[in-house]
């Protein structure tokens, strides 16, 4: 069974999604509120996680462990650094760089996490 987790950092990023879903249950886990329900025939869990990678990771982990989501979508600007991306655009990455992780003084290229490929996820 497919269950999709939808995460947004700010209320404005998830409000319209919650308005379009049939909410069957609302649960508070830690600082986050999870709305469980359906969009069409698809089961969804929607939450505003707060800004930042740690908040997103906590929310995504909760969705995976507690709500057993099979897919996760991040809605919102997602920290875009590209001025050509507009509200409503859908962006699917094929490669990614951890842009704010800098360990060049230790001889690694920008974005490199030791033990991981530079851009392939």
Predicted ranges, named:
Residues 1-2, 86:
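Phosphate/ribose-phosphate-bearing ligand recognition and processing surfaces
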Residues 2-67:
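N-terminal short beta-loop-beta anion/metal-coordinating cradle
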Residues 15-17, 57, 82-84, 101-102:
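Short glycine-/acidic-enriched loop or helix-start segments at secondary-structure transitions
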Residues 86, 91-93:
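Structural signature of FAD isoalloxazine-binding scaffolds in flavoprotein oxidoreductases
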Residues 101-117:
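Acidic/polar active-site rim loop that often engages polyanionic ligands
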Residues 119-121:
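Conserved small/polar residues in nucleotide/adenosyl-binding loops
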